[in-house]
From Swiss-Prot:
This is Defensin BmKDfsin2. It comes from Olivierus martensii (Manchurian scorpion). Belongs to the invertebrate defensin family. Type 2 subfamily. Disulfide bonds join 28-49, 35-57, 39-59. It holds the Pfam family Defensin_2.
């Protein structure tokens, strides 16, 4: 039972991290418009830079 709960929690964390996160090479932190355009190019509604130093491009659903 403990193994199933642990696997479920790991899967939940993995899925949460995979929701719209892309690497900093998409304009962040210097050019948030590049991040926004990248996200639109992959079918999302847009995106913005997040994180302590705004180095991660996060795409909207």
């Amino acid at each position: 039972m403990e193994t199933i709960v642990l696997l479920f929690l790991l899967a939940l964390v993995f899925c949460t991290l995979e929701m719209g996160m892309v690497e900093a090479e998409h304009g962040c932190p210097d050019n948030e418009d590049e991040c926004h355009e990248h996200c639109k190019s992959i079918g999302k509604s847009g995106g913005y830079c997040v994180g302590p130093h705004k180095q991660t491009c996060r795409c909207n659903p």
